[in-house]
């Protein structure tokens, strides 16, 4: 009897182990560009083609309120969603590695002044709002690389230093733009904390 139980347990563990390994391992995604050759992102919610080996969602949870990203709703809409759970939807998804690197680089260097999640602070503007108001990639790049003084439109008394020689910033400007753009368009909600993704690598 014990032999049969042990055998059954062994077979079950092998089946479960095989099932987990049978799920396709995520493959790298080339950094994305839009029709104007500006950096953009790849983010999918719902049923995607990327799962971790245990079958759980990869790294994003989006909360929708009345079919809008929760960051993009008014206070009145948000209050309705608090009162009626049927108006709330949770979506699970993933992002491309370049955008993930942008999130990581932004929170390593930029959030000290521009606030967590690109929301801004008392002494530096919200980059999310800047993109919503039309900040182009070229301007984004130039300000980061060369800085901005009061004569160039910086807030009084708060100049933007140049990061062109900063090796923690300069190589990642495209990726940071991808992340901030995704935030500005409501694809990544506020407060998301992403895990490390060691299996993702850039395509050569």
Show the residue positions of the predicted features.
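Short Fe-S-cluster ligation motifs
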Residues: 141-157
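Sequence/structural segment immediately N-terminal to covalent heme-attachment motifs in c-type
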Residues: 94-116, 141-146
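Bacterial N-terminal signal peptides
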Residues: 9-17
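Bacterial N-terminal signal peptides that target proteins for export
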Residues: 2-9
């Amino acid at each position: 009897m014990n032999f049969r139980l042990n055998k059954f347990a062994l077979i079950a563990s092998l089946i479960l182990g095989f099932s987990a390994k049978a799920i396709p391992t995520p493959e790298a995604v080339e950094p994305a560009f839009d029709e104007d050759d500006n950096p953009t992102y790849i983010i999918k919610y719902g049923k995607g083609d990327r799962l971790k080996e245990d079958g759980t969602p990869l790294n994003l949870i989006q909360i929708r309120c009345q079919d809008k990203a929760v960051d993009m709703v008014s206070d009145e809409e948000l209050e309705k969603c608090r009162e009626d759970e049927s108006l709330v939807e949770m979506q699970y998804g993933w992002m491309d590695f370049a955008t993930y690197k942008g999130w990581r680089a932004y929170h390593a260097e930029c959030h000290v002044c521009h606030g967590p999640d690109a929301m801004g602070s008392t002494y530096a503007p919200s980059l999310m709002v800047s993109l919503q108001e039309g900040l182009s990639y070229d301007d984004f790049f130039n300000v980061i690389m060369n800085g901005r003084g009061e004569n160039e439109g910086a807030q009084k008394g708060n100049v933007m230093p140049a990061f062109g020689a900063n090796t923690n910033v300069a190589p990642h400007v495209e990726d940071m733009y991808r992340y901030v753009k995704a935030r500005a368009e409501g694809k990544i909600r506020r407060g998301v904390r992403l895990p490390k993704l060691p299996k993702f690598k850039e395509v050569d």
